[in-house]
Amino acid sequence: MGKTFAVIGDPIDHSLSPNIHSAAFRELNLDCSYIAYRIPKDELGEGIEGLKKIQIAGFNVTIPHKIEMMKYLDKIDESCSLIGAVNTVVSNDGVLKGYNTDMDGFLEPLKKRNIEIENSNVLLLGAGGAARAIVAGFAKEKAKSITIANRTIEKANNLVEFAKKISLDANAITIDQVGESAKDYNIIVNATSIGLQNESSPISFEGVNEKTVVYDIVYLPMNTDFLKKAKEKNATIIFGYEMLLGQAVRAFEIWHGMEAPYNAMKKALLGGF
């Protein structure tokens, strides 16, 4: 009998995950289906029971359930306990094991381009949901230091504490304090939602050049003002869809124990734009 997979969250109708995973199933002739399943914020427990009833084989978790879902897991992978959030779950006869593929998904496009992360100075804009996985990724790859710039300094300070706990030198500033300092960093990452509504770049790229890597995790629109401004300075740019694809590939491999058909998944993802 075919296996069923899902993505849960609210809102969920804009999710690109069903397209990406369905394309992978077609490419490899797997008897599987993937559905988007809306579970409102305060109905997670009932939603999970519903998934168990249909003998779900695995599911992705998105906003607003990534932290709350931790309570319902029977087992957790180390990526999950480190980041404190879950985005991929395997269900083995109703026994739920959680993983977090955001860190690997984030690092994947950097590795594909052979970008040297070790000893790099990083500027991270934003301290929200994805930021913790990004900090964990830079710690794992032995970045030299990370400056966390956020609208409110408190959230940035919390993330600095987390970074130091996992042996990554870190400091916090507000986004306004970035000023003309972008040129002092090897890698600059936007993990805020600025760009989703076509807003202009939150920082100046004065002095940035082709040696700088600029990465935006916002994936719609694909070409944010942040990336356009970086491109004008000849920086190496990484698109948000690449992280989305990286984490989907990792989730596929966890569920199926085989290499994911990267190109088929990429084509399906880009077709959704």
UniProtKB/Swiss-Prot annotation:
<feature type="binding site">
    <location>
        <position position="87"/>
    </location>
    <ligand>
        <name>shikimate</name>
    </ligand>
</feature>
<dbReference type="Pfam" id="PF18317">
    <property type="entry name" value="SDH_C"/>
</dbReference>
<feature type="binding site">
    <location>
        <position position="102"/>
    </location>
    <ligand>
        <name>shikimate</name>
    </ligand>
</feature>
<dbReference type="InterPro" id="IPR041121">
    <property type="entry name" value="SDH_C"/>
</dbReference>
<dbReference type="InterPro" id="IPR011342">
    <property type="entry name" value="Shikimate_DH"/>
</dbReference>
<dbReference type="GO" id="GO:0009073">
    <property type="term" value="P:aromatic amino acid family biosynthetic process"/>
</dbReference>
<feature type="binding site">
    <location>
        <position position="62"/>
    </location>
    <ligand>
        <name>shikimate</name>
    </ligand>
</feature>
<dbReference type="GO" id="GO:0019632">
    <property type="term" value="P:shikimate metabolic process"/>
</dbReference>
<comment type="function">
    <text>Involved in the biosynthesis of the chorismate, which leads to the biosynthesis of aromatic amino acids. Catalyzes the reversible NADPH linked reduction of 3-dehydroshikimate (DHSA) to yield shikimate (SA).</text>
</comment>
<feature type="binding site">
    <location>
        <position position="217"/>
    </location>
    <ligand>
        <name>NADP(+)</name>
    </ligand>
</feature>
<comment type="pathway">
    <text>Metabolic intermediate biosynthesis; chorismate biosynthesis; chorismate from D-erythrose 4-phosphate and phosphoenolpyruvate: step 4/7.</text>
</comment>
<dbReference type="Pfam" id="PF01488">
    <property type="entry name" value="Shikimate_DH"/>
</dbReference>
<protein>
    <recommendedName>
        <fullName>Shikimate dehydrogenase (NADP(+))</fullName>
        <ecNumber>1.1.1.25</ecNumber>
    </recommendedName>
</protein>
<dbReference type="InterPro" id="IPR036291">
    <property type="entry name" value="NAD(P)-bd_dom_sf"/>
</dbReference>
<dbReference type="InterPro" id="IPR046346">
    <property type="entry name" value="Aminoacid_DH-like_N_sf"/>
</dbReference>
<keyword id="KW-0560">Oxidoreductase</keyword>
<keyword id="KW-0057">Aromatic amino acid biosynthesis</keyword>
<feature type="binding site">
    <location>
        <begin position="150"/>
        <end position="155"/>
    </location>
    <ligand>
        <name>NADP(+)</name>
    </ligand>
</feature>
<comment type="similarity">
    <text>Belongs to the shikimate dehydrogenase family.</text>
</comment>
<feature type="binding site">
    <location>
        <position position="240"/>
    </location>
    <ligand>
        <name>NADP(+)</name>
    </ligand>
</feature>
<comment type="subunit">
    <text>Homodimer.</text>
</comment>
<feature type="binding site">
    <location>
        <position position="78"/>
    </location>
    <ligand>
        <name>NADP(+)</name>
    </ligand>
</feature>
<dbReference type="GO" id="GO:0008652">
    <property type="term" value="P:amino acid biosynthetic process"/>
</dbReference>
<dbReference type="InterPro" id="IPR006151">
    <property type="entry name" value="Shikm_DH/Glu-tRNA_Rdtase"/>
</dbReference>
<feature type="binding site">
    <location>
        <position position="219"/>
    </location>
    <ligand>
        <name>shikimate</name>
    </ligand>
</feature>
<feature type="active site" description="Proton acceptor">
    <location>
        <position position="66"/>
    </location>
</feature>
<dbReference type="GO" id="GO:0050661">
    <property type="term" value="F:NADP binding"/>
</dbReference>
<dbReference type="GO" id="GO:0004764">
    <property type="term" value="F:shikimate 3-dehydrogenase (NADP+) activity"/>
</dbReference>
<dbReference type="InterPro" id="IPR013708">
    <property type="entry name" value="Shikimate_DH-bd_N"/>
</dbReference>
<dbReference type="GO" id="GO:0009423">
    <property type="term" value="P:chorismate biosynthetic process"/>
</dbReference>
<feature type="binding site">
    <location>
        <begin position="15"/>
        <end position="17"/>
    </location>
    <ligand>
        <name>shikimate</name>
    </ligand>
</feature>
<feature type="binding site">
    <location>
        <begin position="126"/>
        <end position="130"/>
    </location>
    <ligand>
        <name>NADP(+)</name>
    </ligand>
</feature>
<keyword id="KW-0028">Amino-acid biosynthesis</keyword>
<dbReference type="Pfam" id="PF08501">
    <property type="entry name" value="Shikimate_dh_N"/>
</dbReference>
<keyword id="KW-0521">NADP</keyword>
<dbReference type="InterPro" id="IPR022893">
    <property type="entry name" value="Shikimate_DH_fam"/>
</dbReference>
